[in-house]
Amino acid sequence: MKMEEMSLSGLDNSKLEAIAQEIYADLVEDSCLGFCFEVHRAVKCGYFFLDDTDPDSMKDFEIVDQPGLDIFGQVFNQWKSKECVCPNCSRSIAASRFAPHLEKCLGMGRNSSRIANRRIANSNNMNKSESDQEDNDDINDNDWSYGSEKKAKKRKSDKNPNSPRRSKSLKHKNGELSNSDPFKYNNSTGISYETLGPEELRSLLTTQCGVISEHTKKMCTRSLRCPQHTDEQRRTVRIYFLGPSAVLPEVESSLDNDSFDMTDSQALISRLQWDGSSDLSPSDSGSSKTSENQGWGLGTNSSESRKTKKKKSHLSLVGTASGLGSNKKKKPKPPAPPTPSIYDDIN
């Protein structure tokens, strides 16, 4: 026999009923207190009567479904503009003008100062980033002076190999035309040495600067007088590509002394000079011709034609002689002896 059965069997019915009543009272009290606490909390927080319906308030907010009236029971006018209240300035604005007004009122419009300041800051940041990426060796290139907008357009046009502008000779800032070599390079963007053959590389290094940029890895296509690079840099590049026997070419190559001499050209010019013709002006020559015609009374058509032919041949010979002389580098003149001054006598 178990312990529980022994304990319950020892009690009479009156005691058992009293115990059951006590337990039941505790359960009812707990449930009532819980319900009372919930009602009290709902009343204090203000949501106790939310589920209840008020007939008067329901009539005020009843949806109207009648012809000629809107859902609020007002007469519908399709020409009346709807109005909205601006959350920033609390002004009533027509619905059609609410969006533009809100942009200007909040400072988000196109012409607002905030957008302008933001654009200025963005442009400054872009200019700084472009200047940091730009190579110091290519500071004075043509594309740098034309501006960033034209630079992008120029690079796009240079990418097209069939563009007729690539075959045209470019003009430098100082007015010199680009090199008339069979290998033509773009002076503004440089050229990659990896795409060149040995003959093209040798031709470029004999006529142009050729120093490789550290940032763009392209060769400088300026002349041998390039102010951005030194002779030591040019010599190092030529030794690297052409071997240790490579020599830096001279800027101006002079002709041999046996080929042509300035004294010979001066003698040729003096021998071909026409007596007194170079000193006469066109008006004097015309008057002299008319005086000769009147004095001698001879037919001067043949003599004038002979003189003009002789003069033309003389000018052509003089031009060729001067052209030959200009191709040769002039010999440096010896320094003039110092002129005596009055201070020498005093000393």
Curated annotation (Swiss-Prot):
PROSITE patterns: SCA7 (PS51505). The keyword Zinc applies. Residues 116-125, 275-288 have a biased composition (Low complexity). Residues 132-141 have a biased composition (Acidic residues). GO terms for biological process: chromatin organization; positive regulation of DNA-templated transcription; regulation of DNA repair; regulation of RNA splicing; regulation of transcription by RNA polymerase II. Residues 116-184, 275-347 are annotated as: Disordered. GO terms for molecular function: transcription coactivator activity; zinc ion binding. Gene3D superfamilies: 6.10.140.1270, Classic Zinc Finger. The keyword Membrane does not apply. It holds the Pfam family SCA7. A zinc finger (SGF11-type) spans 84-105. InterPro entries: SAGA_su_Sgf11, SCA7_dom, SGF11. Transmembrane segments: none annotated. Keywords: Activator, Chromatin regulator, Metal-binding, Nucleus, Phosphoprotein, Transcription, Transcription regulation, Zinc, Zinc-finger. Belongs to the SGF11 family. The long N-terminal helix forms part of the 'assembly lobe' of the SAGA deubiquitination module. Component of some SAGA transcription coactivator-HAT complexes, at least composed of ATXN7, ATXN7L3, ENY2, GCN5L2, SUPT3H, TAF10, TRRAP and USP22. Within the SAGA complex, ENY2, ATXN7, ATXN7L3, and USP22 form an additional subcomplex of SAGA called the DUB module (deubiquitination module). Interacts directly with ENY2 and USP22. Component of the transcription regulatory histone acetylation (HAT) complex SAGA, a multiprotein complex that activates transcription by remodeling chromatin and mediating histone acetylation and deubiquitination. Within the SAGA complex, participates in a subcomplex that specifically deubiquitinates both histones H2A and H2B. The SAGA complex is recruited to specific gene promoters by activators such as MYC, where it is required for transcription. Required for nuclear receptor-mediated transactivation. Within the complex, it is required to recruit USP22 and ENY2 into the SAGA complex. This is Ataxin-7-like protein 3. It comes from Homo sapiens.
